[in-house]
Amino acid sequence: MKKRALISVFDKDGVLELAKFLRDRDVEIISSGGTYKYLKENNIEVKEISEITDFPEMLDGRVKTLHPLVHAGILAIRDNKEHMKTLEEREINTIDYVVVNLYPFFEKVRENLSFEEKVEFIDIGGPTMLRAAAKNFKDVVVLSDKKDYEKVMNEIKENNCVSFKLRKTLAGKVFNLMSAYDAAISNFLLEGEEEYPEYLSVSYKKIQDLRYGENPHQGAAYYSSTEFDGAMNSFEILNGKALSYNNIKDLDIAWKVACEFEETACCALKHNTPCGVAVGENSKEVYLKAYDADPVSIFGGIVAINRKIDKATAEEMVKIFLEVVAAPDFDEDALEVLRTKKNLRVIKCKNTPQAKNYMVTVDGGILVQGEDNKLANEYKVVTEKEPTEMELRDMIFGMKVVKYVKSNAIVVVKDGVATGIGGGQVNRIWATKEALERGKGGAVLASDAFFPFRDCVDEAAKNGIKAIIQPGGSIRDEESIEACNEHGISMVFTGVRHFKH
């Protein structure tokens, strides 16, 4: 029985080689639209789909392959006598290969196009053919990914057929692709309408397999959103080997912290926790301030700066061991210096962080919430003493940092530098003591949540703190306010909590 292949692709890379390979084995090629013209122009013997259906393309190409004569040829089960009898009676030929890739909705949905223009890139005929062929994978070889062309050709060369195992894998890839494609379309259409829809559909594509996860015994891979360009799916590695699982997690937070600030800022980070954060006039200044805040923890850490890095900054950075250095750009002479460290990963971050929903898995489910991107409802002075202008700037700085520290979290600040960071403690007084121990000489203290007792204020006063900022909201707020008044400390309530678990 003569074999037939239906080829209809938007991305034509590799399709000529595949079509020629099939024709050389006497497989009849059927195609439509641009693919038909492309194959014809390249001297591939091809039959137009309208010759099969006796029905022309219509509605500006929206209806080409949506026809019973096409889908019956794909869906008929070859060892089902009734199916084959029906095909024979209606003079329908079987289709044995379906080679289809889709309109580039993933790419177009992120471009600056109108709503109507984006809708036109929603593919209908392609998914319909792919799903039909994938369902009948026992009898039909379905190719939705150009990376699989060679695998199929190799099996045919070696065995004169395509194995059941590969057919099944290719079918699975179709439904994997379709779930992502449909998710992207669904999220596009529901954007702004339904924040938390009945069914959660997410669309991510694998960028790479990772050597391992948090630990060597854990497998891992990195996936990129198909729906928007965030900071972590558009960076460029300028030096060093590929990023690890831990590198990517740490880089994400370090870059978010640095981008919290309009002024030049640096975040040094270790194990997903900031260990030194500073703002200043230039990249060298902020790096040195962040380094001085905790010269021990920064070793082997991640450093992100929200400005171009120059040679002077690079020369300071290579004095110690760092895993990753990230910035929006680098001077050429700075790159030369950084590249003297062969294993230092130098990352050019092209995008600022995008405020999207945050997801975390639990056993049997996923929790979804909005990003913590609200700093304060107000800055309400609740004490007799008011903060100075510099103290208020440090307060706001502290709140920008503390929301990235695991709760309970306290940050001590002095002149635009986080001099002490205490986090991940099960009670607030321990976090306060940790931050004050590391941040001796700090003037302002920021807390991610309210003080349940006055003990944190008393501890702050013993260590020279002059101003405190916190959300407020405790039933014992008055005790903390009274303690501040006793110690001559100003305190500001923001009304916004920043728990991080």
From Swiss-Prot:
Keywords: Hydrolase, Multifunctional enzyme, Purine biosynthesis, Transferase. InterPro entries: AICAR_Tfase_dup_dom_sf, Cytidine_deaminase-like, MGS-like_dom, MGS-like_dom_sf, PurH-like. Pathway: Purine metabolism; IMP biosynthesis via de novo pathway; 5-formamido-1-(5-phospho-D-ribosyl)imidazole-4-carboxamide from 5-amino-1-(5-phospho-D-ribosyl)imidazole-4-carboxamide (10-formyl THF route): step 1/1; Purine metabolism; IMP biosynthesis via de novo pathway; IMP from 5-formamido-1-(5-phospho-D-ribosyl)imidazole-4-carboxamide: step 1/1. Its EC number is 2.1.2.3, 3.5.4.10. Residues 1-144 form the MGS-like domain. One of its GO terms (molecular function) is phosphoribosylaminoimidazolecarboxamide formyltransferase activity. Pfam families: AICARFT_IMPCHas (PF01808), MGS (PF02142). GO terms for cellular component: cytosol. PANTHER family: BIFUNCTIONAL PURINE BIOSYNTHESIS PROTEIN ATIC, BIFUNCTIONAL PURINE BIOSYNTHESIS PROTEIN PURH. Belongs to the PurH family. The IMP cyclohydrolase activity resides in the N-terminal region. This is Bifunctional purine biosynthesis protein PurH. The gene is purH.
